[in-house]
Design a protein with these regions (language model features):
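Bacterial N-terminal signal peptides
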Residues: 9-18
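Extracytoplasmic copper-binding redox domains, predominantly the cupredoxin/blue-copper superfamily
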Residues: 19-144
Length: 144
């Protein structure tokens, strides 16, 4: 009987902790304006969500080599609002493909920017309007 109580207590404790983590997760909004994302740099915690809204003539696409190792790349449908939960710590760079030439790029920093140097290295080799991401990377501090 004592074993059943112990197992029950462990299960209840685990359920509460999982529930608290879900409650603590936040949703952050990125607004797609005519030719820019507002906010263009977002700092969030692991497990938080990002929602892109007002995507009438926009999409959001992660940039190859500029997301953390083990993270899933994404490509939203054109004209559709999009939501993504990020569970891997690091820097994520993304663009709006139709408006890339206008500098419509953004960064999401999840927890500590553990892959910042790798992302900066990839950014240094970008050409054309993709290079606009470099200015945004200068605003991100290296992990402590």
């Amino acid at each position: 009987m004592r074993i059943n109580r112990t197992i029950f207590f462990i299960l209840i404790t685990f359920s509460i902790l999982v529930g608290l983590q879900a409650i603590a997760a936040e949703s952050h909004t990125i607004n797609a304006e005519a030719r820019r994302f507002v906010a263009d740099i977002v700092h969030i915690q692991v497990g938080d969500s990002v929602a892109w809204i007002n995507m009438t003539s926009h999409n959001t696409v992660s940039i190859d080599g500029m997301i953390p190792e083990g993270a899933e790349p994404w490509r939203s449908d054109m004209g559709e609002n999009y939501q993504l939960t990020l569970n891997v710590e690091g820097v994520y760079a993304y663009v709006c493909e139709p408006h890339l030439g206008f500098g419509m790029v953004g960064l999401i920093v999840v927890g500590e920017p553990t892959n910042l140097e790798k992302v900066r290295e990839v950014a240094s080799k970008l050409v054309g309007p993709y290079r606009r991401i470099i200015g945004k990377l200068k605003k991100v501090s290296a992990p402590k």
